[in-house]
């Protein structure tokens, strides 16, 4: 059986091969709805399958989007990657995922690999690119969108949450319960970059405490973002002579580790210790007790990031407002804070 070609589709649809290409590639020129329907019907009838490799060579782009995350084992990043994958599929794209493990060299490794594969664009969920890597992005004329992390340069394109405001909501809520003060479990000095959301979470905690006339001195505790290290830090913190009455954790993963430490030490939550987190991962609702936390619309953020990375015009022009999309944070009240 002879291979079906684009010429065959054009003959059956009564149009040119160029128009068939416009339909298949969704551009660059518009096609009348009636003509589009004829082409799609011809493609279906003939069973035509476009040669994506040839298309990529001709256009110097593929149907791939590169996504680099710090650690896909962490629930927040896994859920964000899943949301990006769904958003990309809605646009006819596929996603390649790389894990940087918070190491700049690994991030650059995936960056170069994805650019070499002619991805349509890159979405970076946390970044630590050096000047050489930034120059390489420019040399490849790559589309790059930051997701979840605030940009360092004014011309960067980013999709973020109101991390600072969300943290303030959580800490204010804990203080409204009448606790003497709220401690904070932040990140570590080694991991944050300039736009790291956890830095905003800590700053939001500081501002809420200051508003209440409370000192933050000696009440910020470092812990890696994952539950396992947070559990170990929690055991030490909760076993100390000055156990905090309430703790705001910069991530839900930290909070889940802290809850495990409290349970092991037979500390009642929220009776003897109130806890709040940030991210509203799926496990937050299943925690014991269910975790009060801060949520954002990850699906909408992912769609926005995909739309931006595929937008040809935004790279050339666009206001600061168009380049920085800030999604609101919402307080999700459950039982770990002391609410019934």
Swiss-Prot record:
Residues 1-59 form the HTH lacI-type domain. GO terms for biological process: regulation of DNA-templated transcription. Pfam families: LacI, Peripla_BP_3. Keywords: DNA-binding, Transcription, Transcription regulation. Residues 6-25 bind DNA. It comes from the Bacteria. PANTHER family: HTH-TYPE TRANSCRIPTIONAL REGULATOR GALS, LACI-RELATED TRANSCRIPTIONAL REPRESSOR. This is Uncharacterized HTH-type transcriptional regulator SCO4158. It comes from Streptomyces coelicolor (strain ATCC BAA-471 / A3(2) / M145).
């Amino acid at each position: 059986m002879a291979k079906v070609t684009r010429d065959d589709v054009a003959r059956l649809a009564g149009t040119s091969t160029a128009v068939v290409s416009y339909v298949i590639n969704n551009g660059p020129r518009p096609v009348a709805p009636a003509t589009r329907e004829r082409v799609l019907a011809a493609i279906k009838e003939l069973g035509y399958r476009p040669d994506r490799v040839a298309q990529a060579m001709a256009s110097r782009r593929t149907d791939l989007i590169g996504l680099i995350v710090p650690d896909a084992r962490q629930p927040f990043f896994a859920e964000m990657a899943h949301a990006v994958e769904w958003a990309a599929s809605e646009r006819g794209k596929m996603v390649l995922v790389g894990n940087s493990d918070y190491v700049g060299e690994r991030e650059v490794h995936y960056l170069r690999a994805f650019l070499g594969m002619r991805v349509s664009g890159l979405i970076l969920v946390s970044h630590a690119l050096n000047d050489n890597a930034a120059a390489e992005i420019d040399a490849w004329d790559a589309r790059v969108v930051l997701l979840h992390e605030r940009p360092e340069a004014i011309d960067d394109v980013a999709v973020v949450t109101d991390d600072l405001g969300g943290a303030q909501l959580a800490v204010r809520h804990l203080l409204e319960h009448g606790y003497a003060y709220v401690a904070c479990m932040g990140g570590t000095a080694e991991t944050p970059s300039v736009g790291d959301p956890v830095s905003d979470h800590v700053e939001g905690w500081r501002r809420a405490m200051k508003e209440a006339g409370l000192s933050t001195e000696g009440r910020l505790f470092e812990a890696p973002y994952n539950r396992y290290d947070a559990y170990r830090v929690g055991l030490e913190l909760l076993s100390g002579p000055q156990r905090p009455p309430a703790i705001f954790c910069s991530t839900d993963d930290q909070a889940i580790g802290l809850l495990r430490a409290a349970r092991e030490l037979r500390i009642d939550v929220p009776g003897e210790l109130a806890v709040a987190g940030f991210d509203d991962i799926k496990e937050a609702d299943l925690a014991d007790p269910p975790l009060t936390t801060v949520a954002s619309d990850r699906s909408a953020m992912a769609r926005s990031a995909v739309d931006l990375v595929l937008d040809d015009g935004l790279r050339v022009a666009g206001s600061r407002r168009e380049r920085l999309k800030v999604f609101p944070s919402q307080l999700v009240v459950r039982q770990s804070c002391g609410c019934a």
